[in-house]
From Swiss-Prot:
Protein name listed in UniProt: Phytanoyl-CoA hydroxylase-interacting protein-like
InterPro entries per the UniProt record, alphabetical: FN3_dom (IPR003961), FN3_sf (IPR036116), Ig-like_fold (IPR013783), PHYHIP/PHYHIPL (IPR042868), PHYIP/PHIPL_C (IPR045545)
Sites bearing Phosphoserine, chain numbering: S11, S12, S15, S24
All copies of domain Fibronectin type-III, residue ranges: 51-160
Classification via CDD domains: FN3 (cd00063)
Function, in words: May play a role in the development of the central system.
UniProt KW Iron keyword: no
Gene assigned in the entry: Phyhipl
Amino acid sequence: MEVPRLDHALSSPSSPCEEIKNLSLEAIQLCDRDGNKSQDSGIAEMEELPVPHNIKINNITCDSFKISWDMDSKSKDRITHYFIDLNKKENKNSNKFKHKDVPTKLVAKAVPLPMTVRGHWFLSPRTEYTVAVQTASKQVDGDYVVSEWSEIIEFCTADYSKVHLTQLLEKADVIAGRMLKFSVFYRNQHKEYFDYVREHYGNAMQPSIKDNSGSHGSPISGKLEGIFFSCSTEFNTGKPPQDSPYGRYRFEIAAEKLFNPNTNLYFGDFYCMYTAYHYVILVIAPVGSPGDEFCKQRLPQLNSKDNNFLTCTEEDGVLVYHHAQDVILEVIYTDPVALSLGTVAEITGHQLMSLSTANAKKDPSCKTCNISVGR
């Protein structure tokens, strides 16, 4: 069952009663966790209704969950509705001046449990929530008798599934544009980074955990280990641009060293940062590697020879590479890469820090790169 949003005055189990303007049911004002009611409440005097306990949350997705609980059998047959108080868990480190999320009050008819709560307008992926429940009995005159609030339970929503990522992929397909030829992947860093790799890692760049840039629900953020590469080219030269936001030293490696018939290609994300530029994250993983197994379970796999973002085809016995022109590709390679496989040199352009996507937050209002689930 999909639970509609309650658009009436409900109180939180952990806050005083508040007036909330809403839609269609009779005006309801529930009690706070201690059972206190305002004088003008439309709820009848408290009668004994079973209080939900032993609450269980399962089947959690990025925008839904199933909830069930136990109740004493006494007066159970009088229950007509359930009231659910759902709130984002307070983040003590959040900006205290930031607008606070409005608590979500839900109402549902008393249906057999477990009950599915679904709604992308109030549930976001990978977000911690608290939930509490009341049982209620609607009276002939429209008033409600309610139980005390249950205990407060915490849970966290899930990442985007393959289904959601496929929806993002389809949106990215629309704007990818024509394909341009390229021959090298490159990675910019500070000189100190490459010195450290030589001294401490045996001359091989090591995968690291991906940051939280991009879609909030992306299953690779904070989980997938890899090394970021770019492959963009300048339209007039066909070569990598001389500017970079990530450092003045660039490692270049022939495309076939990273992307070839022995690797798999996956779609990871599609996002923008309040600008006209859109980014597509792709993952290249050697077949059978830990990174490949991680992606196979979570990400849509692309045909390396035929997709709208990054291709590897064979022409006259030679591998030929193309990248999309109208999106900026961020390519993650999931295995270590030896510096000896390429070259490191200083770029002649500028270090444009403003273009960095490190921990960049996705614009949740962009219609081009958002789907109808939490952002």
